[in-house]
Amino acid sequence: MNVYTVSQLNEQIKNLLESHFVEVYVEGEVSRPTYHTSGHLYFSLKDEKSVIRCVMFRSALAKVPFRVEDGQKLIVAGKIGVYKPRGEYQLYATELHPSGVGSLQLAFEQLKAKLEKKGYFASELKKPLPDFIQTIALVTSQTGAALQDMLRIIQNRWPLVKVYVVDTLVQGSDAAPMIARSIAYADGLGVDVIVVGRGGGSLEDLWPFNEEIVADAIFEAKTPIVSAVGHEIDFLISDFVADLRAPTPSAAMEMILPDRQEMLMHLDLLMQRLTKRMQTILQLKTQELGHLQNSLFQLSPQKRLEFYEKEITIMNERMNETITAILKNSSHEIPHLKALFDQKIEWIWKQKKQDLTSLQQKLTMTMEAKKIPKNSAQMVKNGKPVSLEDIDVGDEVELQDVHYKALAKILSKDAL
């Protein structure tokens, strides 16, 4: 009978298991994953009947793009190892693959959910782009075809824009940190908009734009950012965080820059509208001026004098008609009525004549007043303008200008 010590048996088991299960693939459900401060990951993998403990060291874990969570279905690649002091075995994981979905896709969904929860995709936080962009920063590879495509569109559509090219890696393990630094640099240039872009490629090629460090740089930037990565069918984390998503780098330029031909046509249309509007305003103001001139003429002394003369003529005709009618109907009262009408006519005639004389004097005085130089006055005697030659010592006269009149007495008169 061969009797083993505990250590000997554990050693035999260790050698047997570790030599036989050098590379295994185990599928199961993750249970109680723990990220240790040392950087290692500890978890269990289970199915309906059994559980096996697993460990993944920091060096291998760094290559896993997603975060291991409780309940995930994984395919774990690794080897079996035995911890001899306790006689326990576990699976030392070297690779982790999600069941039914790729690792990168899972990492994408995890980061998308995380950033959405943090508010990175909120529409109310999106920064509006200026209506007319004067300066633009292109964060892309200086040697890539995407840059040449964007510069060509800029030249064709709106060559007046000033362009800053911020060179950066756009794929590879070192690309994401460099893209983040380039975005921060472009944000400090004071441009109107930043376009982060590259041409199409595989999911692995485009992956730097799915990294959290790039998402943070886009979200924290003060300048509006356009994400223009890959082709129209590619949707990346940078697209969701950016203020505007463009399907391609070329499309980004067409979306944010005006077309100079369309702008010239628009300016021509505006000029036509402005010219038509100015012509309309000129016509209206000309009509208003004509109305004002007519109103001013209607209020002039000459017009009022003509009005009174016309009124007197009309009244005279009406009175003659009235007299004729009365004479026909009351011939027996002719002598008496004739005397009354004669008196009335004489009185009315005198009144109207006085009004006419007064108006003529006012008109004359007004016309004369217009000839009076500034700070001078017109001399009036007995209601008529006179000169110094027409007055004598002791006469009382009025001194008048366009605003005031004053009574004066002539104390002396000497020839010059």
From Swiss-Prot:
EC number: 3.1.11.6
Localization annotation: Cytoplasm
Keywords, ordered alphabetically: Cytoplasm, Exonuclease, Hydrolase, Nuclease
Cellular component terms (Gene Ontology): cytoplasm; exodeoxyribonuclease VII complex
GO molecular function, one term: nucleic acid binding
Annotated Pfam families: Exonuc_VII_L, tRNA_anti_2
Keyword Transferase applies: no
CDD domains assigned to the protein according to its UniProt record, in alphabetical order: ExoVII_LU_OBF
Signal sequence segment: none
Main subcellular location of this protein, as a coarse class: cytoplasm
Gene Ontology BP annotations: DNA catabolic process
Reaction(s) catalysed (UniProt annotation): Exonucleolytic cleavage in either 5'- to 3'- or 3'- to 5'-direction to yield nucleoside 5'-phosphates
Taxonomy, superkingdom: Bacteria
Assembly mode: Heterooligomer composed of large and small subunits.
Functional note: Bidirectionally degrades single-stranded DNA into large acid-insoluble oligonucleotides, which are then degraded further into small acid-soluble oligonucleotides.
Family to which this protein belongs: Belongs to the XseA family.
NCBIfam families in the record: xseA
HAMAP family referenced in this protein's UniProt entry, alphabetically: Exonuc_7_L
Name this protein carries in UniProt: Exodeoxyribonuclease 7 large subunit
Organism encoding this protein: Nitratiruptor sp. (strain SB155-2)
